[in-house]
Amino acid sequence: LLAEMGGRLRAYRAAAITPRLFILQQLPHAGWPLVWLLSLVNVALGLLPVIFVVATSVLIGRVPAAAAAGTGSAEWGALVSAFVVASAVFLAQQMLTPLQATLGELMQHRVNGYFHHRLMSVAMRSTGMAPLEDDTTQAAMQQASEMLQTAFRTPGHAASGMLAYIARYGRLLGLAVLVGVVGSWWWALLVLVATMAFRYGQRGATMRMWVRMWTALSAYRRERDYFRDLGLAGATGKEMRVFGLTGWVGERYRDSAVEALTPVWAQRRRYMLYHFLWYTAFALLADGLVLALMVRTAATGQLGLTGLAMGLQATIGAILLGEYYPEADANTQFGMGAVSALEDFDRRVAAYPEPAPAADPTVSAAGLPAHTIRFADVSFTYKGATRPVFDGLDLTLRAGERTAVVGLNGAGKSTLVKLLARLHEPDGGAVLVDGRDVREFPVDAWRRQLAVIFQDFNRYELSVTDNIAFGAIERTAEPAAVRSAAGKMSLLPALDALPRGFDTPLSRQYTDGADLSGGQWQRLAIARALYAVDAGARVLVLDEPTAALDIRAEAAFFDELAEVTRGATTLLISHRFSSVRRADRIVVLDRGRVIEDGTHESLLADGGRYAELFRLQAERFEADPYADLADDAHDEPGRERIW
């Protein structure tokens, strides 16, 4: 029995006490002057109702004598004095209540600002991508983000809610003292127990149940929200209507909403019966007993009119404090849930080891590679996967050479880029730069030598200049250099025609904003990489750079690219074999290993895997020359093809 009680106490401490103590520790983020001022306001709001009960009770007790003595008498003056005090206290409450709300809102913004900053810091803390590519970590991040962004359950609301309890529980203690003064102290104790039982039935276990349910059903809510957004988003409307999906999406939205709410309804019925009704019945019986004893005492003449009025008001006021506190209860409970979600996300990110810092953090990687980059006996497996991506990979990239890496999906092409950029670290072997392990350089120093554009490159809803200049964030954006990078990608006519030229935000959601076609976005992303090369990056990495282009546009594109990247160390990743024939050297990956290495002509002459796949793709194009043409840019208003 003792062990069971100890376990329950530990569980209660973990669920109710520890999170509240943590919330209190966050109050300094709001600033101590604000904390003390809001605390004093809450103390006043706790004491003033008690004083009001005393003043009105005295007022009631003086009515008979004042009525008998008449106006102008000392008794009438005492009655008026009690009325003035009660009125002043009432007015003070009315003035302090909006002040409490205003100061509480200010505290919420300040504390929430700290936690939003912390969420961003945790999400961006890792130098690699491993934590953010893990499904459970992603789910934890989405849960924390969702709970931090919802208006009524943020840590800031929890912080202001914790201070709001000062007013509520201060008033409860004051009213209990009044009950003890006019009656007996066991009456006061019974009133306190009854009120807290009422509180537990109204809020305690019930509110914790809501938080647990809310957290457990997060996946269902995300599915519901996905179908809602799918139905409301303009970008998805065309295809949904063409394929007749609108009715299906509406049904899925309703089904997912019902699926999310059904467990909530069941739990609500259970808690309403076993918690709310039983605890409420006990509280009403206990307070009814106190009220009956109070009236009986007054009937025997042992309690006067003032004492009876004070006792009745204090007892009824106390039981009313057993209700739900809108300014504190949900705010605190859900706010603690938001903090717990953020802590869970933090723990999951921290579970991934960071790369060991460079022995000399001041060492520079500028000018590297001068000779080679070598993947030396590299092995790598994604977390949770059973098959390694690389197992003994040995590949050398020569400085100043354009090397293309081709292979079927799953061959490890994109993973090669991630290892080169140190977004992941090899499980075995090493990436050597001019013979030195890349881990000898600080991560940021090495990445400044890389200009990488991934297949799923970022489309920043910012100006054209920002979208290009982000290639070298440490360099002040120079208009001439930005225009030069755009010009190398033949973008100047299209960009100059935008409403605000290079200052145009690339989103139609903004005033004078505009959007680009898929091919234009791809060229803009490569212009970002070329801007980085102009700023000093030595290695240009292009992962599927022509995914949004048709074959004819692709051929013209690579002719241009060959000119603007001449002399740079270039790594080109592609699944289209026709797009890499202009490379100085072609490497074929299969199952994480290099199986062929040579020029386009030599690999065709060898008749190996490259020749086989190249001819398969060539035969497809010869059979249907338009099979790979992409004409999406022609039908979008305001978009033009520029190649």
For the regions a language model picked out, list residue spans one by one.
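Extended non-transmembrane interhelical loops and adjacent amphipathic helices
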Residues: 1-21, 109-156, 220-263, 336-347, ...
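Membrane-integrated ABC transporters
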Residues: 1-49, 73, 77-81, 100, ...
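An intracellular "coupling" helix at the cytosolic face of ABC transporter transmembrane type-1 domains
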Residues: 29, 145-158, 232, 241-285, ...
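Cytosolic ends of transmembrane helices, especially the final helix of ABC transmembrane type-1 domains
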Residues: 311-348
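Conserved "ABC signature" C-loop
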Residues: 457-510, 531-538, 609-612
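ABC-fold ATPase nucleotide-binding domain signature/coupling loops
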Residues: 492-524, 528-545, 549, 624-629, ...
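C-terminal portion of ABC ATPase nucleotide-binding domains
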Residues: 559, 567, 576, 581-643
